Amino acid sequence: GQQRAVAAISKAFQAHSGQVVLVDGVTGSGKTEVYLRAIEEVVRSGRSAIVLVPEISLTPQTVARFRGRFGDMVAVLHSRMGTGERFDQWDFIRSGEARVIVGARSALFAPVADLGLIVIDEEHEASYKQDSAPRYVTRDVAAWMARERGAALVLGSATPSIEALFRVQHDPTWTAV
């Protein structure tokens, strides 16, 4: 369960090579705890993490769990923010003080210093596909970014996408726990 998932993420993170870990055996708050423990290791090593959650799941309670663990190091980005608030968060991230960025799909493009980990929670969610121009699938962009920046990518889902399951079967840099 949780221990195995955290160990697999730790190994992927330490490889610095864009490895992907699909976490599909842990549900509910257990999955969030896996993310939090993995992020703790990343932050301790001086690197940063981006955590993407579906817009509908980006609740004050979700943010509070991350702030409870990482305090003032947490930045939040979502579509309901005003321009000023978004700018302030962007600036906070760019400064390097924000080590944990929690947000919806667009948070993937935040100017994060020293990216060590990207987490996509509920990776099967349709909201991660951008249908208007420029079109992209968040998972694919995140996998590319992880490779480019020597980070690890974690995909969390109780119902993984067929694409993710296929990659686990056929790509040695992808594992499932």
Model-assigned labels for residue ranges:
Residues 31-40, 142:
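Motif I (Walker A/P-loop) of helicase-class P-loop NTPases
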Residues 25, 104-105, 121-123:
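Walker B catalytic acidic pair
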Residues 117, 124-177:
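Post-DEXD/H (motif II) to motif III coupling segment of the RecA-like Helicase ATP-binding lobe
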Residues 1-19, 33:
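N-terminal pre-P-loop "Q-motif" helix
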Residues 101-117:
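Conserved RecA-like ASCE ATPase "motif II neighborhood" in helicase/translocase motors
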Residues 28:
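Walker A (P-loop) phosphate-binding loop of P-loop NTPases
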Residues 65-73, 77-101, 115:
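Conserved motor-coupling elements within RecA-like helicase/translocase cores
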Residues 17-20, 38-62:
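Conserved SF1/SF2 helicase motif Ia
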